[in-house]
Design a protein with these regions (language model features):
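Adenosine-nucleotide cofactor-binding segment
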Residues: 148, 164-223
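C-terminal hydrophobic helical "lid"/dimerization subdomain
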Residues: 1, 267-317
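Helix-to-beta-strand junctions that scaffold the AdoMet/dcAdoMet cofactor pocket
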Residues: 228-229
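Glycine-rich beta-strand-centered segment in the early N-terminal region that forms part
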Residues: 21-39, 47-88, 94-95, 102, ...
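Rossmann-fold dehydrogenase core element
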Residues: 232-237, 246-286
Length: 317
């Protein structure tokens, strides 16, 4: 089969579109002939060696295609549960940026007729992550305010869509005025340029933020704690700008804040997110499409933070 593999850690130049052995399904696994996959920041981190993985390695967590043994159209849940620990397909195992993948049978679900392969490949990891943060952890309610940093990335657009589907109000940020304008068209209640505008002032004018979706870390942490209202919740699933901001512990007791750490999700989180997508309550925003053979260009686009939504890889059947 053809696959995208890395033989060493590094930049997009280490990605190789090459022949690789067909995977063999172990007991409890099934083979999926992939028709589409998508790109996540996880793929960039694995490519760079965080976490370090045995080489060669096929990247990719998300995918949709045809189950080889039954011919059924399926979507893959990328989460691998190990008790309280959840890992991801393509992190410590070969992933979906290939023509074939072997995955646990319990991770394969029938693909709703309303969804095409590209949409199905675009939603799982980011929507499952967002669902766990907003619904399972923070228990977001209709009418509450959600602060979403960096609208444009997959998790940000997924949290926006789930918040909107639940009847919450959204304050989104970006360093790109063009992305903010698109977010307004999608239905964002407030959209602020975090490089030139005052996010905290906008939050206070709205009455304070009930739930902060924190994925950035050092660059936004202080403003997140200033923007959240007393009794509010901060959900953390990443720290793309660095993991060691000043803690500002006094804000936690004075405001009686609750902080939730979250990563990926359970089978139940996946199914909850899937229901929102297939019912049409939450939209899946696809930024761009690249043939599997052009995955390097897809990585370069994500590295430049040019995307607004998910980057999809198309795989000929």
């Amino acid at each position: 089969m053809k696959a995208i593999r890395i033989h060493e850690d590094g930049g997009p130049e280490v990605l190789r579109y090459e022949d690789a052995p067909d995977p063999v399904a172990k007991p409890g696994e099934v083979l999926v002939s992939l028709r589409a996959a998508s790109l996540n920041h996880l793929d960039l981190w694995v490519r760079k060696g965080l976490p370090s993985a045995p080489k060669p390695r096929i990247l990719g967590a998300d995918g949709a295609g045809v189950r080889v043994d039954t011919g059924e159209r399926v979507v893959i849940n990328p989460g691998l549960e190990h008790g309280a620990v959840i890992t991801v397909i393509g992190e410590h195992t070969d992933g979906t940026h290939a023509e074939l993948v072997a995955v646990p049978e319990e991770n394969v679900f029938p693909l709703d007729d309303a969804l095409d392969f590209e949409t199905a490949a675009a939603f799982p990891l980011v929507f499952e992550t967002a669902y766990r943060m907003l619904v399972t952890k923070a228990r977001l309610q209709a009418g509450e305010w959600v602060l979403i940093w960096g609208i444009g990335g997959g998790v940000a657009t997924a949290t926006f869509e789930i918040a909107r589907a639940l009847g919450a109000r959204t304050l989104v940020t970006s360093g790109s005025d063009a992305k903010l304008e698109r977010a307004r068209e999608w239905g964002a209640d407030l959209a602020v340029n975090h490089a030139t505008g005052d996010v905290v002032a906008a939050a206070k004018e709205a009455g304070g933020i009930d739930v902060v979706v924190e994925t950035v870390g050092e660059a936004t942490w202080a403003r997140s704690l200033a923007a959240v209202k007393p009794g509010g919740r901060v959900t953390v699933c990443g720290a793309t700008s660095g993991p060691n901001p000043p803690a500002q512990l006094h804000r936690f007791w004075w405001k009686q804040l609750t902080v939730y750490g979250s990563t990926m999700g359970t089978r139940e989180d996946f199914l909850g997110a899937y229901e929102l997508v297939r019912s049409g309550k939450a939209r899946v925003h696809v930024d761009s499409r690249f043939p599997l053979s052009e995955t390097r260009a897809a990585h370069e686009r994500m590295e430049r933070a040019e995307q607004l939504g998910k980057i999809v890889l198309t795989i000929p059947g």
